[in-house]
Amino acid sequence: MSRFAAAAFFVLFGLTVCFADAAAPRVLPEGKQPNDTRLAAPKDLNGYFPLVMPQSKEEWAKRADVVRRQIAVAEGIWPTPERTPLNVVIHGRIDKGDYTVEKAYFESVPGFFVTGNLYRPKNKSGKVPGVLFPHGHWNDGRFIDIGRQAVRKEIVIGSERFENGGRSLLQALPVQVARMGCVCFHYDMIGYADSTQLSFELGHRFAKQRPEMNTTDGWGLFSPQAEAHLQSIMGLQTWNSVRALDFLLDLPEVDSSRIAVTGASGGGTQTMLLAGIDSRVTVSFPAVMVSTAMQGGCTCENASCLRVETGNIEFAGLFAPKPQGMTAANDWTKEMATKGFPELKQLYTLLGAPKNVELFANTHFQHNYNYVSRAAFFGFINKHFKLGVEEPVVEEDYDRLGRTELTVWDVTHPKPASGDDFERRLCSYLAEASRRQFDALQPRDGASLAKWREVVGGAVETIVGGMLPAKSDLEIADQQVTEAGNHTRFTGLLKDKSRGAELPAVLLQPSNWNGRAVIWLS
């Protein structure tokens, strides 16, 4: 410290300040902690995640930008990754009379494939709406078949209508969407159906660390290196959704002004996140997911830094004021009508579009995307896309396709590489691609410095939970003044009102102060 001719010490510390030659001055009694939100019990996915209502449109616009950036940073897609060639393959067209079904796959990043089925209407001219359909944690995903006995039980309680079509709730939706005159891409969640490059166990059941994947070079997901690089299953799924939207919009018949995304459960998570960060989506319909309660019970729905001082209600709010519908059931969404949705309605009202948000609460059903919930979606897009289908829109039965008819892989289109080595290569590629982007941002002049601060500074702000508080947010509480010979000691609690932070602090000011200061953080 000899380089500083300082005689004033401003000391910030957790509980006490330690000096070698004197008893440590205390701000709080022994054993008492500051009333700091960061010292509270950690909030887990089953906590309470309400929306804090903004007071003005301007306040919300600023907050929305912060939350969108937080999502992107947490998911490792900040700045937006390079959009590499999709290398689209569409094959195996099946004609079902009034619609067709095709097998489609493409690369979201080089060597990593998004797989699914493309449903298209027949006998349509001109541009038609496009619908993205990510699915949740339904057994076998896109290939789901709940069987004859199970669907009969669903029919008895009014959850499904048809014994054949009801066996696949996931196939029923895109069929009806195509019959209504829309193109629908139904794609796999990582680890489901044809998306097997990263396994189901890795993506959705990870619980035990793998020493062989926790290396400083050639690491895998869920490792310290992957977390440090913000690489996650959730980030990969979100990027898959962004590229699925690229794919959909590249289809010549799709109307870019009428793009919807819908999914239930984990598919609802994917829906609200894509709709929240990608402005190209014009209608969003997350089913049985948006709530103030449980935020997503799978590793694929969580990422480091994601839900810090935010949650799913606010994520859904990012889509306002554009049309958004959602469903509730007898699950964690059962209280949406009184907790969460009223605040979303207030937000839409603030933004001048109170009629653009709707909740379809069918809490007499368990967790679902059943016939009744699908009907709500069909009516919603019929209204907002002006499809002209007679109301009420009634879903009809269809000829259900099996696994062999839906799978994208065959002798001519073999499965791509998978397993641990592929996982290592994927993580390595993502890290190197990100490094190239940040290297390109190195400031060279005033304009590039501003961009560096926006991108890199923005990432740092998200990761550390904010930057310097405004002066107006700071105050000293419980201040005490003690004369101690050649100096005066001030103690108190330095409060940051904007974050609920509270730091014990000591200020030592000499009698003959020279106007210079040293800050000691301990």
Please tell me what each predicted stretch does:
Residues 295-352:
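The feature captures the conserved acid-bearing segment of alpha/beta-hydrolase catalytic domains
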Residues 7-17:
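Bacterial N-terminal signal peptides
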Residues 138-141, 192-196, 267-271, 291-297, ...:
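Flexible loop/turn segments at secondary-structure boundaries
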Residues 20-114, 327-504, 508-518:
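Alpha/beta-hydrolase-fold serine-hydrolase catalytic core, especially in secreted/extracellular enzymes
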Residues 1-4:
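Positively charged n-region of N-terminal signal peptides that target proteins for export
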Residues 236, 243-308:
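Primarily recognizes the serine-hydrolase "nucleophile elbow" in alpha/beta-hydrolase
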Residues 127-130, 180-183, 255-258, 279-283, ...:
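Loop/turn elements at helix/coil->beta-strand transitions in domains of secreted/extracellular proteins
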